[in-house]
């Protein structure tokens, strides 16, 4: 039985529609296992970014976990590190996987994603090796990059077929 569900609308009339299904438990967010044993866990803001990054890397060599969203203060607000709260999904996963040695942080490359990445790194750096792996383009996430790669490949195929 499903323990966690996230809703997202595609036709939003200019406003994003995102919500969790009532009764969802964030300890059980979207998780992709590796094909072989792995000591690395990659964490993402959402399931779509988890799948997009897997598509871009073309390898299932590590655990991949969606955090079910992140918290970050609004840009420009003064914040204290104490406002950071560990992700229930990440805490639940790590408590059941003592073999994990590395956390690869793959949040979005926007203010919220960078803020979350910095605070996740600080929170876990004493227990795990931390790898920051944000998308190289400012303002992007891995779904944006996967879409861009797909569109480039489709354009090349159309060009090749029109010759």
Stretch-by-stretch model annotation:
Residues 1-96:
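Phosphate-handling DNA/RNA-contact segment within nucleic-acid enzymes
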Residues 55-163:
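TOPRIM fold recognition
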